[in-house]
């Protein structure tokens, strides 16, 4: 039986651990991880994201700081490290945050969480409203689909010609991401891209009452939006906050699939 040690204890990882036990793995979630935990494991499952500062593990439920360098030094070369948006160079490491199936499935609770925020933070129905989705990646596409199903008039921005064709074929209005300031005459904006696409001065002509940032790095200045009367919400990591059960199930299936081909 392969042993998986889970570092970090948010509800996503706790759910994933329980499901992985049901799959037949031995799973441990140490309250205070130490070098012995790293050395005795076949697999280390790290949190989402693995780090926020590039030096320590992003595990707020663990009281002491866990340094990535200590994990790398203490983990045997035979141990498989499953990380998210971080790679341990020179180690046997797989970034599950880059797994296509995981990212696509994870886009569903992200989209639902974003819609829940929009319903909560606006005084009007989504039906009949004008929604701008910045970015045509996995999250952008799933979100646009759900918004259209609720009766929104949806505009999706993209950069590539193929994406414009896809957007049009799906029945959405199109916008060039590089010219996004021309399309801010809307009711709600959802940003999914990790670069700044809306300049501070652009908010002066923006009619939206709400802008939600789903990206991890941010695509706009929230303070500038607020100064112009727009409610701005930074909302990275929504699956773990709004649907931890589903997010944990998705993670567990992803881990199982990875281990099936790598152990």
Outline where the language-model segments fall:
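Residues in the short beta-alpha loop(s) of Rossmann-like NAD(P)-binding domains
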Residues: 10, 33, 85, 159-161, ...
């Amino acid at each position: 039986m392969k042993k998986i040690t889970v570092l970090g204890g948010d509800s996503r990882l706790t759910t994933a651990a329980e499901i992985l036990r049901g799959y037949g793995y031995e799973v441990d979630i140490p309250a205070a991880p130490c070098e012995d935990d790293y050395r005795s494991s076949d697999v280390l499952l790290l949190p989402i994201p693995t780090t926020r500062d590039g030096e320590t593990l992003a595990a707020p439920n663990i009281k002491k700081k866990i340094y990535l360098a200590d994990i790398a030094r203490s983990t045997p070369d035979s141990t498989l490290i499953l990380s998210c948006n971080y790679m341990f160079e020179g180690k046997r490491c797989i970034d599950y945050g880059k797994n296509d199936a995981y990212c696509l499935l994870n886009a569903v609770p992200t989209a639902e969480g974003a819609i829940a925020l929009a319903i909560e933070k606006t005084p009007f129905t989504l039906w009949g409203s004008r929604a701008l989705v910045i970015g045509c990646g996995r999250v952008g596409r799933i979100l646009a689909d759900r918004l259209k199903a609720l009766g929104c008039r949806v505009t999706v921005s993209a950069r590539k010609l193929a994406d414009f064709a896809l957007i049009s074929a799906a029945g959405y209005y199109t916008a060039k991401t590089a010219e996004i300031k021309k399309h801010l005459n809307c009711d709600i904006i959802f940003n999914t891209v990790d670069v700044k696409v809306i300049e501070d001065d652009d908010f002066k002509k923006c009619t939206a009452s709400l802008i939600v940032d789903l990206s991890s790095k941010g695509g706009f200045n929230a303070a500038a939006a607020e100064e112009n009367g727009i409610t701005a919400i930074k909302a990275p990591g929504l699956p773990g906050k709004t649907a931890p059960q589903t997010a944990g199930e998705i993670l567990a299936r992803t881990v199982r699939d990875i281990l099936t081909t790598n152990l």
